[in-house]
């Protein structure tokens, strides 16, 4: 009898836990994805803060020349970063227990792998939590689908690119100047500015900013006034009101006359779908571009391919970019190799005599 009561009590405790996790009445929805999201993001955030402040220098290139990234080792907020895991580790899974000591783990950049892998798992769970809450509230799943774009972008730079390049040392450093360094090196080695998917990503981000500004300004300019002239028009809105808060017909008419009729949406649902889909598609293209360039399917290279009828090279802006890429690559890992890989791979001319 006692055993039966204990089983019922334990079952009820588990049942109450399940109800609490999946309840939409909580101030913050937990969800089953949240059960995994919370510890992984807490771990990533905690290690990031500690490492950014106090981590010792990391031998990123695997040549016994450690690079400092933390505040206590001479950096500031701008120059500080979590230095990627050493090239000596490559793509090996490198938890603390795989190192001979904590000092060795820190020297080889173990915190970077820990932070990145926990972060990627955490943001993926956040996306799943968005879907889970939408499902329980009877909403459509497109919030999670839109969030998939930045998740894909983060996965591309922190996981897919290192896999393609053969080492976590090629991943993006976790810091401001480290991000810029990653961008410059990426341009030098892959010519990303000449990649169509990057161009589409730029169109998505800047186009999304433009469309959001246009939409917000049109809505703000065509509010249905519910207040007197002495009060702010914003005070006329009540949360949850059934009435329209702005006149879409007026906004449509204004923009249609400003550009042309069919440049303006007359369907609010189509308009907001477009506002969401445009930047999301752009970020997807960028993430796809990073993932393909990870395996060295690089941007266009018109290297001396534009010639006149006599075969003479016509200098173009593409040639200027190629020269800039070589210059940036010379400066990258300057102690690891003395020449750009593009030059070092060329066979030396034969010398007779």
UniProtKB/Swiss-Prot annotation:
Site (Tyrosine radical intermediate): 161
Post-translational modification N-acetylthreonine, affected residues: 2
Transmembrane segments: 29-46, 118-133, 142-156, 197-218, 274-288
GO cellular component: chloroplast thylakoid membrane; photosystem II
Pfam families noted in UniProt: Photo_RC
UniProt key word Heme: no
Residues involved in chlorophyll a ChlzD1 binding: 118
Entry-linked Gene3D superfamilies: Photosystem II protein D1-like (1.20.85.10)
The reaction(s) this protein catalyses: 2 a plastoquinone + 4 hnu + 2 H2O = 2 a plastoquinol + O2
InterPro entries: D1/D2, Photo_II_D1/D2_sf, Photo_RC_L/M, Photo_RC_L/M_CS, PSII_D1
A biological process from GO: response to herbicide
Cofactor-binding details, from the entry: The D1/D2 heterodimer binds P680, chlorophylls that are the primary electron donor of PSII, and subsequent electron acceptors. It shares a non-heme iron and each subunit binds pheophytin, quinone, additional chlorophylls, carotenoids and lipids. D1 provides most of the ligands for the Mn4-Ca-O5 cluster of the oxygen-evolving complex (OEC). There is also a Cl(-1) ion associated with D1 and D2, which is required for oxygen evolution. The PSII complex binds additional chlorophylls, carotenoids and specific lipids.
Something else known: 2 of the reaction center chlorophylls (ChlD1 and ChlD2) are entirely coordinated by water.
Function: Photosystem II (PSII) is a light-driven water:plastoquinone oxidoreductase that uses light energy to abstract electrons from H(2)O, generating O(2) and a proton gradient subsequently used for ATP formation. It consists of a core antenna complex that captures photons, and an electron transfer chain that converts photonic excitation into a charge separation. The D1/D2 (PsbA/PsbD) reaction center heterodimer binds P680, the primary electron donor of PSII as well as several subsequent electron acceptors.
Family, per entry: Belongs to the reaction center PufL/M/PsbA/D family.
Protein name: Photosystem II protein D1
């Amino acid at each position: 009898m006692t055993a039966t009561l204990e089983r019922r009590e334990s079952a009820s405790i588990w049942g109450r836990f399940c109800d609490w996790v999946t309840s939409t009445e909580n101030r913050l929805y937990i969800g089953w994805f949240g059960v995994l999201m919370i510890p992984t993001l807490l771990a990533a955030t905690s290690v990031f803060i500690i490492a950014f402040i106090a981590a010792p220098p990391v031998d990123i290139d695997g040549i016994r020349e450690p690079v400092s990234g933390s505040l206590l080792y001479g950096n500031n907020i701008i120059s500080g970063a979590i230095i990627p895991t050493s090239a000596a580790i490559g793509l090996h899974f490198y938890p603390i227990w795989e190192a001979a000591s904590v000092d060795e783990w820190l020297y080889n950049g173990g915190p970077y792998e820990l932070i990145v892998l926990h972060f990627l798992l955490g943001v993926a769970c956040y996306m799943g939590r968005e879907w889970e809450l939408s499902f329980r509230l009877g909403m459509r799943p497109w919030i999670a689908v839109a969030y998939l774009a930045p998740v894909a972008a983060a996965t591309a730079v922190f996981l897919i690119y290192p896999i393609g390049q053969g080492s976590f040392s090629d991943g993006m450093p976790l810091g401001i100047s480290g991000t810029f360094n990653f961008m410059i090196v990426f341009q030098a080695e892959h010519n990303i500015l000449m990649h169509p998917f990057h161009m589409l990503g730029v169109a998505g981000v800047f186009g999304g900013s433009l469309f959001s500004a246009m939409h917000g300004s049109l809505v703000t300019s065509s509010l249905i006034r519910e207040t007197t002239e002495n009060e702010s028009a914003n005070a006329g809105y009540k949360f949850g009101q059934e009435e329209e808060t702005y006149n879409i017909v007026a906004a449509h008419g204004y923009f249609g006359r400003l550009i042309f009729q069919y440049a303006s949406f007359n369907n609010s649902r189509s308009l907001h779908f477009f506002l969401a889909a445009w930047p999301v598609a752009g970020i997807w293209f960028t993430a796809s571009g990073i993932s393909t360039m990870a395996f060295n399917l690089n941007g266009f290279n018109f290297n001396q391919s534009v010639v006149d009828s006599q075969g003479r090279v016509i200098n173009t802006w593409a040639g200027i970019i190629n020269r800039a890429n070589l210059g940036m690559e010379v400066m990258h890992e300057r102690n690891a190799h003395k020449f750009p890989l593009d030059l070092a791979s060329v066979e030396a001319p034969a010398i007779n005599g």
